[in-house]
Design a protein with these regions (language model features):
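Conserved beta-strand segments of alpha/beta enzyme cores
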Residues: 68-70, 149, 181-183
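Conserved SGNH/GDSL esterase-like catalytic core that processes O-acyl groups on lipids
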Residues: 29-31, 39-125
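Second-shell loop/turn segments in exported
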Residues: 40-45, 122-129, 159-162, 198-204
Length: 223
């Protein structure tokens, strides 16, 4: 009788362990980094629903969300300011959360930066090179802090950011991502659909554009 009880208890413990492991591996902690694309900046200078928010919704439907941190992103973020945030272990005052800790604990990290920094009429080759140099450092640091899923969005051409410039920049970014085993998600085709933008005067997508970006990320990572 005692043997049966012991076996029953061991079986229950083992089953609980299996169930715990299944649910544990399904839990997701998302950290979003970047500029106005990451925050959901709109033509009306207000923050809307971003692709990160749509990703959060996607994970809520398919997995369990532990945490979603989007406050590290800033609509005027540049590669330089993001790099310094990482190096200086920037702290969110609202929650007293350190960025390195948040990144270390994250299971899914997204980065979208470069549109605010590079899309202006006096863009120089030096600025592009500085951007790529900073992105190299950022990507390297992220891999130091985290060994799980990291997604970097491509740039796309718009007004001052010419198609050929974007192509060269994206090729460099893609190579950096390949070296560090990071997902590089190409969203350059977003500019081929006017329905994805508020109007022709803004580089920021509307909610349809952000849904498109979310879908491209899901396809790249999970398909």
């Amino acid at each position: 009788m005692k043997k049966i009880i012991i076996l029953t208890i061991l079986g229950a413990v083992f089953l609980s362990f299996i169930i715990y492991q299944c649910f544990y591996h399904e839990r997701v902690q998302i950290v979003a980094l970047g500029d106005g694309i990451a925050t959901g900046e709109t033509y009306y200078d207000v923050t809307g629903y971003s692709f990160n928010d749509y990703l959060r919704d996607y994970f809520e439907e398919t997995k369990q969300i532990d945490e979603y941190i989007k406050e590290f992103a800033d609509k005027k973020e540049t590669s330089e300011t993001l790099k310094m945030k990482l190096l200086n272990n920037y702290i969110l005052e609202s929650t007293d959360t350190k960025i390195q800790q948040a990144l270390h604990e994250a299971s899914f990290i997204t980065i979208a930066t470069g549109t605010y920094e590079l899309n202006h009429p006096k863009l120089t080759t030096k600025e592009i090179n500085n951007y790529l140099k900073n992105m190299n450092k950022i990507i390297s640091l992220l891999r130091v802090y985290n060994d799980k899923t990291i997604v970097l969005l491509s740039l796309y051409p718009f007004r001052y950011l010419e198609k050929e410039e974007v192509k060269e920049i994206n090729e460099s970014l893609k190579n950096l991502c390949t070296e560090k085993n990071i997902y590089f998600v190409d969203i350059t085709n977003i500019v081929n659909n006017n329905a994805y933008f508020f109007n022709k005067d803004t580089p920021y997508p509307n909610y349809k554009g952000h849904r498109y970006i979310k879908d491209e990320i899901v396809k790249a990572v999970f398909d």
